[in-house]
Structure formats: structure tokens, C-alpha cells
Amino acid sequence: VNTLPRLLTGMTVVCLPLAAAHAQHLERAAEGIDCAHVTSTMESDLCTSDRASDADVLLNTTYKQARHQLQQQAANGSCTHCGAAEQQLIEAQRAWIQLRDKDCDAVYAFNADGTSRNGAKMHCLTTHAQDRTRQLRDFYEL
């Protein structure tokens, strides 16, 4: 079996989203914003938004890797239930997205009267994405 196409697909799934995330950081630097030392609410919001985006990129990459692994194991016959497992993973991810959104909307509402509301929501999104990424890596041994 030729593994080169699978390797290239896997590399594409990982590298393209990471390149986009790196471009965001370069954009902040070009704007003169140092996310390690923010000086305004606007800068803080931009930086926390970037962190949430980075976490989301990593989560999406990990999710695609899990699906790809299930598809490959189903195709080569090493896992007789991987087709069904992939469908269940898709449904679980959709349900998780709804949970995350509702949870982070609640965090935003709780902080709605202050200037930290956007940052609080972005922090919530980041934390959820990081937790889900860890779960997928653990569950699917990625």
C-alpha cells in the first residue's frame, strides 16, 4: 500500500491551518500590538480573539485527524465499526459545538455590563476548544 498520499493528506490537514494562525500573529505584530503586553481593551480583545482562533484551528485539525483515522481503519478493515463511529463522532461534535456556544453565551451575558465581556467569551471559547482537543487526542490516540 502506498502511504505517500495518506502522508501528504495528513500533512495538508495539519500545516495549512497552522500557517493561517501564524499569519494572524504576524498581522498583530505589523499593527504594533504585543499580545504579551496589551495596553487597551481593544488590544486585549484582538489578542484573546487570536488565541481563541488558534485553539479552534488546532481543534479542527485534531477533529479532521480523528475522522481520517476512522475512515482509514474502516477502509482497510482493521475496524469493523469505524464507519458508525465516524458518524457518531460527527454528531457528537455538532452537539459539542452547541454546548460550547450556549456556555460561552452565558459567560458573555454574565459579563455584559463590563468591558471584559468579549475577552471573557473568547477565553471561554479557547478553554472549551483546548479541552475538546485533549479529549479527541485521548479518545482516538492521536
Predicted regions and their residues:
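Short, leucine/isoleucine-rich alpha-helical interaction segments at C-terminal helix-coil junctions
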Residues: 11-14, 139
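N-terminal alpha-helical modules
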Residues: 22-142
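Hydrophobic h-region of N-terminal signal peptides that target proteins for export
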Residues: 13-21
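Bacterial N-terminal signal peptides that target proteins for export
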Residues: 1-11
